Structure formats: structure tokens, C-alpha cells
Amino acid sequence: MQRMKSLNVIGCGRVGTTLAALLQRHGVCEVQDLYSTTLQTAQETARFVGAGTAAARIADMRPADVWMLSVPDSQVASVAAALAKQALAYPRPSMAFHCSGFLPASTLKPLQALGWQTASVHPVFNFADPVRCVAQFNGTPCGLEGDESAISLLRELLTAIGGDCFSVQTGSKPLYHAAAVFSSNFMAVLQAIAREGWSAAGVPEALIPRIHESLLRGSVENLLVMGPAKAITGPAARGDTAVVAIQGALVSQWHPEAGEIYREMSVLARRLSTTGSTASPTEARAA
């Protein structure tokens, strides 16, 4: 890169704040203008990043080389339309990307119509707290999709801040993102059910975090070292059908939705332990 690219950010949540801070602090981009749902949020992000001017409206944002739209999926299209309206007054097209793992770059079509290069970037990372995220981002896989020229620039920018970039096929994005949901988001739901179950079973509240940590750490370590098929344990994996049936019924009495999850997960656990895959034989042959 010959010079720092100017960067504008629309959406100062955890993802936008983290990426803006990394791009600024690594000397990759010069953060210029920041816009969010409230002016205060944009101002707080500017302070955290150490650069940038908070804008009260998208219309107040100056032209920039790169635009990051780190907004909820439901807002990407409308924000792109608002930016395209403003961009009519800009001297030349720019490059814009959104951070949705689900939506394709074509969601930014109002900008594409103006000659902008567009892409989507999905860092495969749990953005919980910007301070921790900035410190832990190095080595994060980043899925890229969109225009080749935009992908080329983003690969350069993200690699410079520690990202490990790979390409995602446009038509595969929904399934790709669903896999990430299974890997990360649903894990939190399952852990919450486990904690609630221990509490309902009378386990002392002070002991629950220790039980939780012991099981979770061991499971994660085994998964990373051995892979899912060899790491799977429990009554379903062992084929203890009587235990599974009784336990499933009891769980359903306590928590109907959790009972349904227990039954379905038990089927998949048994299949994984015996065949090495959660897919049914018919599904596996079709694939």
C-alpha cells in the first residue's frame, strides 16, 4: 500500500469499532468520519479508535476511499441506498463493504449502480468486547466475497491487521454463515440450558460455574485436538437408548423446548459416533 486509505464507518457497534481501531492503529487506514445510531456512540468510537470525526448524519460524511457498513443485516440495504443518494455529490466512486456473514455484496447494489466496487467481509470471530477483540484479532479467518478489485484491496488491508483471508462463494453465504451460528452462537444457548438445568436439579449456585468450566474446557480441548467424531461422548454416543429415552422425557417435563433439542441432538450424536458425520446416509450420498 502506497498511502493510507481514508476510511468512513457507518455503524459503530462492536465489529465496526474493533475493525476501525485495528486499521487505524496498524497504520493501514486513516479513520475519517464515523456515523452510528446516536452521535454519542460515534463519539465514543472516535475516542476508542483514537481518530475520526463523529457525524450526526450520513449526509455530513465526507468522501472517503473506503466505506465500512457495519450495521445489522436488516439495515444494510437501506443504509446503502442512503449512502448512494449522498454519493451522487462525490467526485468519484469509492469502495464499500459490509460485514454481514449472511448477505452478499450485491446488497450494496445502489452503490454498484454508481460504479462503486463492493464486497462483504465476515471475520470469523466472536466480537464481544472491542478492547479484548483488538488484542485477540491476530490470526482471525476473514471470509471475503464480492468484486475482485474490492476483494484484492480488502485482502491487503485485513492481512495487514492480522486477518487470514479466504474466499466465500456468493451462493453459499447463507449456509456458510449458518455453520458459524452452529459453531458459536448456539453454543451459548446450549451452555445456558446446561446452567439452568443444573440449577433446577439443585446443584449449589456457587458450584455451577466450576462444573461448567470443567466440562466446557475439556470439551473444547478435545474437539480441537481430536475432532468432533472422536471427541463425542455421552449416553447417545454410547448407544444407551434407555438412558436417552428417560432423560429426554424428564428434560421435556422441565423445559419442553430443551427436551426437543435433547432428542434431536441425541440422534445426531449417535450418528456422529457411529458414522463420523451428522448427515443421514441418504444425505451423505446426495452430497
What are these regions (language model features)?
Residues 3-6, 93, 139:
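Phosphate-coordination loops involved in phosphoryl transfer and adenosine-cofactor binding
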Residues 33-36, 96-99, 144-145:
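Short, hydrophobic beta-strand segments that form beta-sheet elements in well-ordered domains
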Residues 39, 49-132:
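Rossmann-like NAD(P)(H) cofactor-binding subdomain of soluble oxidoreductases
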Residues 209-287:
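NAD(P)-dependent Rossmann-like dehydrogenase/reductase catalytic/cofactor-binding core
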Residues 41-48, 113, 117, 132-224, ...:
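Internal alpha-helical scaffold of NAD(P)-dependent oxidoreductase catalytic cores
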Residues 1-57, 62:
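NAD(P)+-binding Rossmann beta1-loop-alpha1 motif at the extreme N-terminus of oxidoreductases
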Residues 17, 21-25, 47, 81, ...:
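Short, well-ordered alpha-helices that flank and scaffold nucleotide-derived cofactor binding pockets
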